Amino acid sequence: MKVDLDWVHHKLQEVVNHAYTPFSKFKVACMLVANNQAFYGVNIENASYPVTLCAERSAIANMVTSIGKATIDYVFVYFDTKTPTNSPCGMCRQNIFEFATDKTQLFCIEKDKSFKQFTIPEILKGGFRSYEQ
């Protein structure tokens, strides 16, 4: 599948407006592709900080709610900030790992359209699974 990063960037710029970030103002949007379907998520902050939900986990919850367990082919994470070199937090990396394969592609996309591309094993060495995939 050829990835149209311009389209993804444009779509996630729209989706990120739904992020609820009254505390940090650090808006993030995520799009997962699984079974040739797109699933979206945004970060949702809470006054009780540990309750905050990251965009990646929000998108995974959307996917599982919509179609059940599926294998993620692509993860696109958009950071609406001027801070360069963003990437998913450790908790999100482990959560993505649960639904990914070694071939799953992760794109970290910045506001200025610059991006970094990774495979899941590159960003999470020794991820934990309680079952064989």
From Swiss-Prot:
Zn(2+) binds at residues 54, 89, 92. Its cofactor is Zn(2+). Residues 3-131 form the CMP/dCMP-type deaminase domain. CDD domains: cytidine_deaminase. Pfam families: dCMP_cyt_deam_1. PROSITE patterns: CYT_DCMP_DEAMINASES_1, CYT_DCMP_DEAMINASES_2. Substrate binds at residues 43-45. Its EC number is 3.5.4.5. GO terms for molecular function: cytidine deaminase activity; identical protein binding; zinc ion binding. The keyword Iron does not apply. The active site is at residue 56. It catalyses: cytidine + H2O + H(+) = uridine + NH4(+); 2'-deoxycytidine + H2O + H(+) = 2'-deoxyuridine + NH4(+). One of its GO terms (cellular component) is cytosol. Homodimer. This is Cytidine deaminase. It comes from Mycoplasma pneumoniae (strain ATCC 29342 / M129 / Subtype 1) (Mycoplasmoides pneumoniae). The gene is cdd.
